């Protein structure tokens, strides 16, 4: 942030951010921007306060809104057109494509580099299964929410078969625990904690593979604006997007205060969703360990790679799913507001990116004594 008040007059007096679920640590960068003067409205499921940039008041307010049940489970892209008070909303690559003709939005920054969605199973029951493709070959029942793009896509690609996918999952742990021999969808930054510490009748580690690592590389929960407002919003976004980038970096470095705010928000909403310090801390660590939050190949946190977006569009078209013919990454995403100087310290994209794919020690044989 350049100085106090830098967003006043260029951004809306209240920057409204629509998220896709109850408050959770995966949304940490959003709540990181909410100042200590915050007000939580449990009925409307919002958290509002001064919009802060690394502790500096930007001169406008920010309101972070819960999604999911809070908006009747409406997709956040569609919600942007239902409620024009929303400044930015979470938008997934596949949703942007799906709604493009009726509700076009442009992604401007992605706090998450990898989608946290995964499939998990009990490694004691399936010791030789390591990937989603392995689940397909073994014909393991896969319990998922209905209507998910990636399950339809994996069926179309032959990774999974339609008869093994059961779209009746309702979020309850009962079946996974009772049957023991099924795979189930979840967030890699959440469910592994719950099934080890919260659901004590299971009480052990799961094994999982990210949907991303299985070949479906959407940008999940990226921030988007309505497409026809992009140029009008540009003076605001030029200043706001780097603040969002830095907020995510700040949250990952020191999440304690913001996680406490997230927990307070969940308690105020007082619904079926619960959250505590244990899962909040686990979530941040998992996001780092799995590279869910990481710098892209250009060294910055939050930018988009066209090849990734275009690959998802190609996958949708090959599977016979909606993706307008001429649509490409350059329509759906922009890096024009990204500050390439802002990223996780220490080149987090490489530290995370090699674990598990390269040998634990990479040995390089040179041809002489050490020399320049």
What are the residue ranges of the model-derived segments?
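N-terminal Sec signal peptide cleavage junction
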Residues: 1-2
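Short, glycine-/small- and polar/acidic-enriched structural segments
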Residues: 5-169, 182, 186, 209, ...
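Soluble non-cytosolic domains of exported or imported proteins
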Residues: 24, 71, 144-148, 185-189, ...
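Short, solvent-exposed loop/beta-turn-alpha elements that line the ligand-binding surface or hinge
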Residues: 38-57, 210-216, 231, 291-303
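Pocket-lining segment of extracytoplasmic ligand-binding domains
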Residues: 94, 169-272
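Short, surface-exposed acidic
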Residues: 160-165, 203-208, 268-286, 322-332
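Secondary-structure end/capping motifs
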Residues: 232-320
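Conserved C-terminal helix/tail region of periplasmic/extracytoplasmic solute-binding proteins
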Residues: 306-362
């Amino acid at each position: 942030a350049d100085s106090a008040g830098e967003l006043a007059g260029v951004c809306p007096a209240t920057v409204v951010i629509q998220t896709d679920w109850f408050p959770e640590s995966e949304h940490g960068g959003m709540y990181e921007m909410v100042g200590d003067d915050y007000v939580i409205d449990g009925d409307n499921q919002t958290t509002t306060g001064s919009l802060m940039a690394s502790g500096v008041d930007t001169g406008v307010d920010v309101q972070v809104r819960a999604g999911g049940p809070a908006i009747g489970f409406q997709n956040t892209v569609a919600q942007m057109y239902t409620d024009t008070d929303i400044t930015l909303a979470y938008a997934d690559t596949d949703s942007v494509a799906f709604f493009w003709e009726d509700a076009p939005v442009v992604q401007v920054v992605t706090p998450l580099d990898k989608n946290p969605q995964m499939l998990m199973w009990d490694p004691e029951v399936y010791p030789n299964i390591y990937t989603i493709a392995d689940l397909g070959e073994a014909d393991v029942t896969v319990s998922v929410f209905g209507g998910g793009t990636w399950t339809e896509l994996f069926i179309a690609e032959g990774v999974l078969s339609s008869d093994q996918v059961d779209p009746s999952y309702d979020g309850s742990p009962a079946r996974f625990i009772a049957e023991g021999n099924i795979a189930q969808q979840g967030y890699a930054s959440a469910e592994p904690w719950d099934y080890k510490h919260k659901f004590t009748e299971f009480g052990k580690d799961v094994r999982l593979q990210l949907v991303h690592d299985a070949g479906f590389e959407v940008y999940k929960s990226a921030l988007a604006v309505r497409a026809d407002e992009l140029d009008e919003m540009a003076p605001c976004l030029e200043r706001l997007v780097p603040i969002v980038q830095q907020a995510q970096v700040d949250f990952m470095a020191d999440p304690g205060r913001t996680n406490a705010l997230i927990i307070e928000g969940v308690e105020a909403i007082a619904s079926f969703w619960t959250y505590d310090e244990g899962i909040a801390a686990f979530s941040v660590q998992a996001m780092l360990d799995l590279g869910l939050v990481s710098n892209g190949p250009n060294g910055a946190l939050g930018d988009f790679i066209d090849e990734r977006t275009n690959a998802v569009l190609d996958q949708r078209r090959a599977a016979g799913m909606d993706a307008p013919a001429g649509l490409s990454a350059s329509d759906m995403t922009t890096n024009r507001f990204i500050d390439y100087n802002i990223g996780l310290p220490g080149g987090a994209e490489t530290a995370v990116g090699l674990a598990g794919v390269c040998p634990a020690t990479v040995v390089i044989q040179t041809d002489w004594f050490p020399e320049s």
